[in-house]
C-alpha cells in the first residue's frame, strides 16, 4: 500500500500516497491540524473535480486523531463539506479565501451550517495571501458575511443577538485558537 522508506524510485500515485500518509502520521504524532486546499484553485485550467473534499474521506476515517482543516469551504463542494464536518469529529471547515471567491455562497453556507454543523467546527476567516492588503479586505468581507448570516438566523428565531455575538466570536477567535493550540492569543 505504501512505498517503503528504503525504496528510492517511488513515483506517481504510490509516491503521492506515501507522502500523504507520511504527513498524516507526522501531524498525528505532533498533534498538529492538517490543512488541505479543496475546491476552487487559483489560476486557470485546474480540474475542479480533483478538489472535491469527499476524495479525502478515507483519510478522515483512517486518521481519526488528526484534525483536518479544510480550506476554501470546498467551494463549489460546500454542501458536501457540510456533511463531512457533521459526521466526522475531526473535520473542520475553514472559510479562508472563501469570502473573496463567493460572498453569497459564504452567507448561504453559514445559514445552512447553523442548522446542520456544530458551529464550533467553523473557522470564519483566514487566508493564504501573497500581499498584506488581502488580509484586511478579506477580514472585512468575512465580518460582513458572518454578520449577514447570523442576522438571518436571529430573524428566524434560532437564537438571539447575544448568542449571535458569541457564535461570531467563536468562529473568528475561539475555534481557531483551540484547533491550532494557541495559548497566549
Predicted feature residues:
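C-terminal structural cap/anchor segments
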Residues: 72-124
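Active-site gating/metal-coordination segments in enzymes
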Residues: 1-33
Amino acid at each position: 500500500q505504501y512505498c517503503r522508506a528504503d525504496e528510492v524510485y517511488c513515483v506517481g500515485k504510490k509516491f503521492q500516497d506515501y507522502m500523504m500518509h507520511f504527513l498524516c502520521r507526522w501531524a498525528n504524532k505532533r498533534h498538529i491540524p492538517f490543512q488541505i486546499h479543496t475546491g476552487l484553485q487559483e489560476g486557470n485550467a485546474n480540474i475542479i473535480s480533483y478538489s472535491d473534499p469527499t476524495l479525502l474521506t478515507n483519510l478522515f476515517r483512517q486518521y481519526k486523531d488528526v484534525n483536518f482543516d479544510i480550506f476554501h469551504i470546498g467551494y463549489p463542494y460546500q454542501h458536501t463539506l457540510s456533511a463531512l464536518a457533521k459526521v466526522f469529529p475531526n473535520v473542520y471547515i475553514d472559510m479562508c479565501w472563501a469570502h473573496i471567491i463567493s460572498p453569497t455562497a459564504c452567507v448561504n453556507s453559514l445559514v445552512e451550517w447553523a442548522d446542520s454543523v456544530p458551529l464550533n467546527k467553523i473557522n470564519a476567516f483566514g487566508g493564504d495571501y501573497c500581499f498584506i492588503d488581502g488580509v484586511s479586505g478579506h477580514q472585512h468581507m468575512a465580518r460582513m458575511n458572518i454578520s449577514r448570516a447570523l442576522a438571518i438566523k436571529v430573524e428566524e428565531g434560532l437564537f438571539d443577538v447575544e448568542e449571535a455575538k458569541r457564535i461570531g466570536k467563536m468562529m473568528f477567535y475561539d475555534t481557531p485558537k483551540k484547533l491550532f493550540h494557541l495559548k497566549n492569543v
